[in-house]
């Protein structure tokens, strides 16, 4: 398989959609404070649809190829005649690069965490999820039992 050696493929990152300094809202000048929080993009919905279809789901809305090609058309890429799940994941990586750690969570969800180790850094399963704050565990002790 591929050897992952770059930050965008292996770590949580959110660096897209920053505005040029002449378009900043006065008073909102800290790193990241001037960008609106994007919950989800239509391209991501299309890519999730394509992933579900390549994993065996059915749909009357559109095919996996149609979903991928809708994303590719917007960015000026040539259409594909067929797609595999691996191609869908690569398309998702390209389309959503640097957005919200999507690749990181995909790799954890798909059990491909070996791809998250690179440059002498080793991913371990305890890094899959953020810890539950101790104040919440103190309020509801059963939360601490899932370690």
Each model region followed by its residue ranges:
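Weak global preference for isoleucine
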Residues: 4, 11, 40, 68, ...
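Long, intrinsically disordered, low-complexity segments
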Residues: 32, 36-37, 72, 77-147
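Extended, hydrophobic/aromatic-rich amphipathic alpha-helical segments that build helical scaffolds
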Residues: 36-70, 85-94
């Amino acid at each position: 398989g591929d050897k992952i050696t770059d930050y965008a493929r292996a770590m949580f990152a959110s660096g897209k959609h920053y505005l040029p300094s002449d378009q900043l809202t006065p008073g909102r000048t800290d790193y990241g404070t001037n960008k609106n929080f994007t919950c989800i993009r239509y391209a991501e919905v299309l890519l999730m649809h394509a992933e579900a279809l390549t994993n065996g789901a059915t749909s009357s809305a559109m095919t996996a190829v149609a979903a991928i090609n809708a994303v590719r058309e917007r960015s000026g890429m040539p259409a594909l005649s067929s797609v595999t799940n691996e191609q869908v994941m690569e398309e998702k990586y390209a389309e959503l690069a640097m957005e919200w750690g999507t690749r990181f969570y995909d790799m954890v969800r798909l059990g491909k965490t070996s791809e998250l180790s690179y440059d002498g850094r080793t991913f371990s399963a305890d890094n899959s999820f953020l810890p539950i704050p101790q104040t919440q565990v103190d309020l509801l002790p059963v939360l601490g039992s899932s370690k």
